[in-house]
Curated annotation (Swiss-Prot):
Its EC number is 2.7.10.2. Residues 458-547 form the SH2 domain. This is Tyrosine-protein kinase Fes/Fps. Autophosphorylated on Tyr-711 in response to FGF2. Phosphorylated by LYN in response to FCER1 activation. Phosphorylated by HCK. The modification Phosphothreonine is found at T419. The modification Phosphotyrosine is found at Y259, Y711. Homooligomer. Interacts with BCR. Interacts (when activated, via coiled coil domain) with TRIM28. Interacts (via SH2 domain) with phosphorylated EZR, MS4A2/FCER1B and HCLS1/HS1. Interacts with phosphorylated KIT. Interacts with FLT3. Interacts (via F-BAR domain) with soluble tubulin. Interacts (via SH2 domain) with microtubules. GO terms for molecular function: ATP binding; immunoglobulin receptor binding; non-membrane spanning protein tyrosine kinase activity; phosphatidylinositol binding; protein tyrosine kinase activity. Residues 1-258 form the F-BAR domain. GO terms for cellular component: cytoplasm; cytoplasmic side of plasma membrane; cytoplasmic vesicle; cytosol; focal adhesion; Golgi apparatus; microtubule cytoskeleton; plasma membrane.
Length: 820
């Protein structure tokens, strides 16, 4: 099979031309590709050379190490590789690429020559085989007609003269016919031979020579490609040698010995600074105190007990933190072990991030263990000191003994049933240190329409489309949201009972639906709302009412934090302002290190307060839960807590003011009782006082809402304020509004003793035993008899015998009216 036997037809000629065009396109593609390869290799070689220059041949300025030596070898070999690649690029350009260009020119010339020769052969065949023969045949027919006509005239002639003339014409016509016949015979023979030569010799010869040249060019192209591959190959001996040198340099790295040289050069013996000790010079001008020993006397016993409770609570949280972090470390170690078994050694880099997380978790565990150890040591010091005291009374302060001896016996007898004057003294001493705090400066208020989109009440963020219908209730209700996954803003409007959604177009920093553009979406919405212009001419929809987002949700950026004003069980408390309107707020934070279940308890307070609105209940403003740390934002009550207020201002307060303030507390608790809310931690320290001496119930961290008004607690008494808690709650974990009434009785006692601590000389366990035996707190010195009788009713052992908060409030109002 070959061109000469298979491609002689016109269809074969067309196929040959298409094949030549396709091969030329292929060759042109090869030439462009090789030219790009030459360019790329030149650029690559240049980049490698530039990298070597920048790296300085692998010579760093840091300390010597095996890795740096190996890296120097790699960069040096890379420079050699760049020179080799540059030479390869030049060889490609002068060799295969140049030859390929010449081959393309020859192939183009061959295509042109073949086309011209084929056309010439076809033209000659057509002329000889068709045109010339047809012309001879046409002339033959004409001469045959002339001869036949002359013969008829000759045969029909009768006269001699006419006959001779007709004969002469007949003879001439025969001569012409016979001569043309011979020419036709010769023409037919020539055409037959031309036909034979064309189809058997000339056309096959042309095609055969074409095939031979094509095959020769294919052979040349093969040699060009072989040369190209030889030059561009990356497995040449030179390239392989370079890479073997690099591989040897890498193989010389020994991770276990990498830093031995560094340690020999820079290592030194540990220089541990001396541990802190008690500075005895502090005692030179002060009281004769024992260095490093806790002072437990009548002035400090209360603070030591409270500190022990606080440290114990913090130790509980720290222990939970340690356990959670130990579990996290164990989980990470298990995951790493499984992944290392299922990961190829060369994919170990994928595990680095998790290994770093493990190291961070181990470090965090060490920090938690350190915190736990510190708290444990502090608790042991406090416990040992209190156990050393035993059930007896704390030793007196020497400085105050003379004052105590000068007191008359009648006064001592009276003080047996009243609050000791020493307690009032301690109250005033502690009041000297009442914390003062400054507020962050007011912010310049921005008009609502100029606030950014995320601060607009009607902007709901990435609200799912399915939830829009639940928020839009009346025709014309609208909100703006972010389209999920499309980074577009959508205006959603309820119209004719159906939610309609309009994509807000953004172009050239302008926002529009139809018509004019505006510099911001708030400006666009404000214009549509004020002008009542239809959103689109086709829809005719107009905006009527903006649907605000959940009022409790705040962003961390909505707050400006001031200084720390306190500390709770979960974290610090700060003063602050809302950026939107400069509202003063108190911001309670939750430590990031707390376990999730503790954080859930922190948010319990906000969950409770969301439902309440009362002048004597501290007001919730919002929560920030989008990121850490979590905040609960509440109104800022600038007067501080009620306990500190009593200890600092109590001596200057009128009796009516004290009655009014406990009446405020009763009103707040009456409201909570109506909502079936159990506070569980009612005490003076958990009430706040405004600048106008209005009291507000606060600190709902332990509060619970129960439909039947009874809450059964579990988990022990580690965080229970024993001296304020009713017997049934301590014994059985049964909390109710009646148990809050017991705590309110203690609050009354704190109020009229001006901030003294209940059961000052008793531990928590001793207090429980004292109450179970029927013991109760004595009447404070300044307390009206009617109020003390109310206290005693609050301390009835049986919960059902205690008054309700409604009755307590009415009784306090009555006492206040009677009091001058």
């Amino acid at each position: 099979m070959g061109f000469s036997s298979e491609l002689c037809s016109p269809q074969g000629h067309g196929a040959v031309q298409q094949m030549q065009e396709a091969e030329l396109r292929l060759l042109e593609g090869m030439r462009k590709w090789m030219a790009q390869r030459v360019k790329s290799d030149r650029e690559y070689a240049g980049l490698l050379h530039h990298m070597s220059l920048q790296d300085g041949g692998g010579r760093g300025t840091g300390p010597y190490s095996p890795i740096s030596q190996s890296w120097a070898e790699i960069t040096s070999q890379t420079e050699g590789l760049s020179r080799l690649l540059r030479q390869h690029a030049e060889d490609l350009n002068s060799g295969p690429l140049s030859k390929l260009g010449l081959l393309i020119r020859e192939r183009q010339q061959l295509r042109k020559t073949y086309s011209e020769q084929w056309q010439q052969l076809q033209q000659e065949l057509t002329k000889t085989h068709n045109q010339d023969i047809e012309k001879l045949k046409s002339q033959y027919r004409a001469l045959a007609r002339d001869s036949a006509q002359a013969r008829r005239k000759y045969q029909e002639a009768s006269k001699d003269k006419d006959r001779d003339k007709a004969k002469d014409k007949y003879v001439r016509s025969l001569w012409k016919l016979f001569a043309h016949h011979n020419r036709y015979v010769l023409g037919v023979r020539a055409a037959q031979l031309h036909h034979h030569h064309h189809h058997q010799l000339m056309l096959p010869g042309l095609l055969q020579s074409l095939q031979d040249l094509h095959q020769e060019m294919a052979c040349i192209l093969k040699e060009i490609l072989q040369e190209y591959l030889e030059i561009s190959s990356l497995v040449q001996d030179e390239v392989v040698a370079i890479h073997l040198e690099m591989a040897a340099a890498v193989a010389r790295i020994q991770p276990e010995a990498e830093y031995q040289g560094f340690l020999r050069q820079y290592g030194s013996t540990p220089d541990v600074p001396p541990c802190v000790t008690f500075d005895e010079s502090l005692l030179e001008e002060g009281e004769p105190l024992e260095p490093g020993e806790l002072q437990l006397n009548e002035l400090t016993v209360e603070s030591v007990q409270h500190t022990l409770t606080s440290v114990t609570d913090e130790l509980t949280v720290a222990t939970q933190t340690v356990l959670s972090r130990q579990e996290a470390v164990a989980q990470l170690q298990r995951e790493l072990q499984n992944e290392e078994q299922n990961t190829h050694p060369r994919e170990r880099v994928q595990l680095l991030a998790k290994k770093q997380v493990l190291q961070e978790a181990l470090q965090a565990l060490q920090v938690a263990l350190c915190s736990q150890a510190k708290l444990q040591a502090q608790r042991e010091l406090l416990q040992a000191k209190l156990e050393q005291l035993g059930p007896g009374e704390p030793p007196p302060v020497l400085l105050l003994q003379d004052d105590r001896h000068s007191t008359s016996s009648s006064e001592q007898e009276r003080e047996g049933g009243r609050t000791p004057t020493l307690e009032i003294l301690k109250s005033h001493i502690s009041g000297i240190f009442r914390p003062k705090f400054s507020l962050p400066p007011p912010l310049q208020l921005v008009p609502e329409v100029q606030k950014p989109l995320h601060e607009q009440l009607w902007y709901h963020g990435a609200l799912p489309r399915a939830e829009v219908a639940e928020l839009l209730t009346h025709s014309g209700d609208f909100l703006v949201r972010e389209s999920q996954g499309k980074q577009e803003y959508v205006l959603s409007v309820l119209w004719d009972g159906q939610p309609r959604h309009f994509i807000i177009e953004s172009a050239d920093n302008l926002y529009r639906l139809e018509g004019d553009g505006f510099a911001s979406i708030p400006l666009l919405v404000d214009h549509l709302l004020r002008s009542q212009q239809p959103l689109t001419k086709k829809s005719g929809i107009v905006l009527n009412r903006a649907v605000p987002k959940d009022k409790w949700v705040l962003n961390h950026e909505d707050l400006v934090l001031g200084e720390q004003i306190g500390r709770g069980n979960f974290g610090e408390v700060f003063s602050g302002r809302l950026r939107a309107d400069n509202t003063l707020v108190a911001v309670k934070s939750c430590r990031e290190t707390l376990p999730p279940d503790i954080k859930a308890k922190f948010l319990q307070e906000a969950k409770i307060l969301k439902q309440y609105s009362h002048p004597n209940i501290v007001r919730l403003i919002g929560v920030c839960t989008q990121k850490q740390p979590i905040y609960i934002v509440m109104e800022l009550v600038q007067g501080g807590d009620f306990l500190t207020f009593l200890r600092t201002e109590g001596a200057r307060l009128r009796m009516k003011t004290l009655l009014q303030m406990v009446g405020d507390a009763a009103a707040g608790m009456e409201y909570l009782e109506s909502k079936c809310c159990i506070h569980r931690d009612l005490a003076a320290r958990n009430c706040l006082v405004t600048e106008k001496n209005v009291l507000k119930i606060s600190d709902f961290g332990m509060s619970r809402e129960e439909a039947d008004g009874i809450y059964a607690a579990s988990g022990g008494l580690r965080q229970v304020p024993v001296k304020w808690t009713a017997p049934e709650a301590l014994n059985y974990g049964r909390y109710s509004s009646e148990s809050d009434v017991w705590s309110f009785g203690i609050l009354l006692w704190e109020t009229f003793s001006l901030g003294a601590s209940p059961y000052p000389n008793l531990s928590n366990q001793q207090t429980r035993e004292f109450v179970e035996k029927g013991g109760r707190l004595p009447c404070p010195e300044l307390c009206p008899d009617a109020v003390f009788r109310l206290m005693e009713q609050c301390w009835a052992y049986e919960p059902g015998q205690r008054p309700s908060f409604s009755a307590i409030y009415q009784e306090l109002q009555s006492i206040r009216k009677r009091h001058r």
